[in-house]
Design a protein with these regions (language model features):
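Repeat-based blade/solenoid architectures
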Residues: 55-76, 103, 125-137, 176-187, ...
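Blade-edge beta-strand/turn elements of extracellular beta-propeller
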Residues: 46-49, 117-126, 167-177, 244-256, ...
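Short, conserved, GDST-rich strand-edge loop motifs in beta-rich repeat architectures
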Residues: 93-104, 203-230, 391-409
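Beta-propeller blade signature
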Residues: 107-112, 233-240, 291, 348-349, ...
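Gly/Ser/Thr/Pro-enriched helix-cap/hinge segments flanking short amphipathic alpha-helices
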Residues: 23-36, 42-45, 53, 63, ...
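Asp-box/WD-like beta-propeller blade repeats and closely related beta-sheet repeat scaffolds
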Residues: 122-141, 146, 151-191, 201-228, ...
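Hydrophobic beta-strand segments that make up the repeating blades of beta-propeller
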Residues: 87-94, 144-153, 199-203, 277-282, ...
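Beta-propeller blade termini
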Residues: 74-84, 111, 132-146, 161, ...
Length: 576
């Protein structure tokens, strides 16, 4: 976020020129002209099906003219199978009024009816709790085969245990989780590889209604303050002790820096040592790259790696984040959504613990310069085997155009198609997808079980939007669901590798990423024209390794860590 940040930027350039050396690509300079949009993959369209689907959700930011900081941020969305019927449901997080107005603002849990429609079943689900919710993370923390839900909230975070049948129970008090801070994004991961998933919670700033500050864009009218105005606060790491109990190990583990102002978190293994690391996006503070040392502690390597600052040596307004191997180099790279006039960051993992920001010299940076990006992720929307980029955009101030004519409050999302060899081009996938909105959370998953990946956006103080992917499944695909036995039940931290005639791909099974949201856990591999997966290999956190050969495309494969493939063919469809 940004107000009078020019002084800070100038000061950073003078005092910190050496800090960003790891982030500068030698010999590279920003291109002089933006690249022309390239056509999308043939026949792929994102169709707005919100009205037809029955999703009728409007986010309540609580805004009433007082310009409280949280009102500008918005909440997230999770796509997961809440009731175990094999279809993704939609959980939309909500805020609330600051003062009672005789209405109740609840989250929404949309049950998938298996026919392209959804029904809100929040009432009586146990998730029907009024709170000023922000983010959501989903995983099976007790290894009982059902997905549990963690919600960050200004009223105190909540942990909901999945009781089965789409019913949940608030177990926060009994769990030992006590995050009373300004929680935003969260991620489940088994950082100590003991077979039980732990919880990382990103916290933002020290804010309360009675300590809200007065800020202005023009010196006359109150506007939303930027995070520079508030002190930071430490994020939290809760170790799963088993039996539904958690222990706060934030300080002991080395991830509780009190100066942080965190909005996004991504789980990755950037050095390939088999231990899950964390990248934390900070707003006007240096980003964090926590290297898992394999002994219960982490070390921040962001400065040395070149991901703490921009290449000018300043901390950007970082919000959403994701990680993926977009160029088949065998290493995960980082994507970060930033503030207006800061562009997306696309940190390429060079190996040896060093990253280079490729965005300034690429279409990704040029096109995203003026947008303000919250939700971001890599996903293969056209199933050609190359991860593409989506950015959900929208400004904080409704009046921003009055003081910055080139900047708009509502902004269209950006979709960058991966052309191979590390190159991206903007993609046109229908007029509805290009509609400006005040987007915040963003998640992807196969809502209709047809193979390709659909998208859900949340908007701040506005409606949720559901986009169906039409035509992505003209290419072939394989989805892999992992069921841990020695490892955690969800298989989080498992490396999945796929080889077909078109080459090799891999990913890490994980949660988190984007902004305050969670996408489908089971990874989907695009295969392009390939109809057969030659090899499917899994490396589990326990050390178990599995290898399967000659699997037909266009199916969901369920792999049990002990038994091997226990289900295949569920969701098989013919490419359209």
């Amino acid at each position: 976020m940004k107000s009078a940040r020019k002084f800070l930027l100038a000061l950073s350039v003078v005092l910190l020129p050496v800090l960003a050396l790891g982030a500068v690509a030698p010999g590279k300079a920003p291109a002089k002209a933006a690249a022309k949009p390239a056509p999308a993959a043939k026949g792929v369209t994102f169709t707005d099906i919100t009205a037809a689907s029955g999703v009728k959700f409007t986010h309540n930011s609580g805004r009433s003219g007082k310009k409280y900081l949280p009102e500008s941020l918005g909440s997230g969305v999770a796509l997961f199978d809440a009731d175990g019927d094999g279809w993704l449901d939609i959980l939309l997080i909500n805020g609330r009024d600051w003062d009672p107005k005789g209405r109740t603002s609840l989250p929404a849990l949309y049950h998938n009816n298996h026919d392209g429609t959804f029904t809100n079943v929040i009432r009586g689900s146990g998730l029907d709790v009024q709170m000023y919710g922000m983010g959501v993370a989903v995983a099976d923390y007790d290894n009982d085969g059902r997905e549990d839900v963690y919600v960050t909230s200004l009223d105190g975070d909540r942990l909901f245990h999945n009781e089965g049948g789409g019913k949940f129970k608030d177990v926060t008090a009994a769990s030992g989780i006590r995050n009373a801070s300004f929680g935003t994004s969260a991620a489940w991961l088994d950082y100590d590889r003991d077979g039980k998933v732990d919880l990382f919670v990103a916290n933002y700033v020290q804010w309360s209604r009675d300590k809200d500050l007065w800020c202005s864009l023009d010196g006359a009218i109150k506007s939303y303050c930027t995070p520079e105005s508030y002190k930071g606060t430490g994020s939290k790491l809760y170790r799963n002790l088993g039996g539904g109990k958690f222990e706060d190990v934030s300080q002991k583990a080395g991830v509780g820096d009190p100066t942080s102002k965190s909005l996004g978190v991504a789980v990755l293994d950037y050095n390939g040592d088999g231990w899950p690391d964390l990248f934390v996006a900070n707003d006007t503070q240096p980003n964090k790259l926590y290297r898992n040392q394999g002994n219960g502690t982490f070390k921040d390597e962001a400065l040395e790696a070149g991901v703490a600052f921009s290449e000018e040596g300043t901390a950007r307004g970082a919000m959403g984040v994701d990680a993926a191997d977009y160029d088949r180099s065998g290493r995960p790279h980082l994507l970060v959504g930033n503030f207006t006039n800061e562009m997306l960051a696309l940190y390429h993992n060079e190996g040896g613990g060093v990253f280079v920001d490729e965005a300034p010299s690429s279409t990704v940076g040029q096109v995203s310069l003026l947008t303000l990006t919250f939700g971001v992720f890599f996903f293969d929307y056209d199933l050609d085997g190359l991860p593409d980029i989506l950015a959900a955009n929208g400004h904080l101030e409704e009046e921003i155009n009055r003081v910055q004519p080139r900047i708009q409050y509502k902004e269209p999302p950006l979709l960058f198609r991966n052309l191979g060899n590390g190159k991206f081009a903007t993609a046109a996938v229908g007029s509805a997808f290009a509609r400006p909105m005040v987007a915040r959370g963003a998640a992807y998953g196969d809502l209709d079980n047809d193979g390709d990946l659909d998208v859900v956006f949340t908007t701040n103080h506005g409606p949720a939007v559901v986009f169906r992917n039409d035509g992505g499944n003209r290419n072939h695909w394989l989805r892999v669901k992992t069921v841990g036995t020695r490892s955690n039940r969800d298989g989080l931290g498992t490396v999945v590798r796929v080889t077909s005639a078109g080459g090799k791909q891999w990913t890490l099974v994980r949660t988190g990423s984007s902004y305050c949201s969670q996408s489908e856990i089971a990874p989907t591999f695009g295969l392009g024209p390939d109809k057969v997966v030659q090899t499917l290999e899994l490396e589990w956190p326990s050390g178990t390794r599995q290898r399967f050969t000659n699997l037909p495309a266009n199916q969901v494969v369920t792999v049990d860590e002990t038994k091997g493939i226990v289900g295949a063919g569920v969701g098989v469809v013919k490419a359209k």
